[in-house]
């Protein structure tokens, strides 16, 4: 299982995996630097906590933000730019990707995403329950269904092709286990242990 370490400000400082791999996190002003296997990734945030840049060995990614904190564009190394469009309510209506083209989005009166159409005219349709919780996501190939308990916690995500993920929570509403089941009924279970409000270990079975 993974071991998590935190500093006196309750910030994550290290993740130690059973394999011996360790990831460290260092903090300086509005920047956080993560080092894993000798590779450093520096993330910088603005005064409101919004990510504005990522620097790694491949170069710099810059996030240009609107006044509401949402990105208007993201510029990757080589000046590769992804652009975003929004409606008057601040809802994303388009995403222009240099490799995959433009995706458009449509919403219902409650602001729920109803339809997503990509550059190849492939459509994803979404439905919601009376509490505006996502109920189904339907693609041409399959449908994914979402189930909740009386505490508004997501308990199951199941696909029409036979895969599923089950979630169990403790009395404090924290995720205590997650079981992923494949089409052949093989599964992976993760059990979470907490120290205060932080995950202290994850056990895989």
Question: Where do the protein language model's features map onto the residues?
Answer:
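Beta-strand elements of repeat-based all-beta scaffolds
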Residues: 1-56, 60-76, 80-97, 101-118, ...
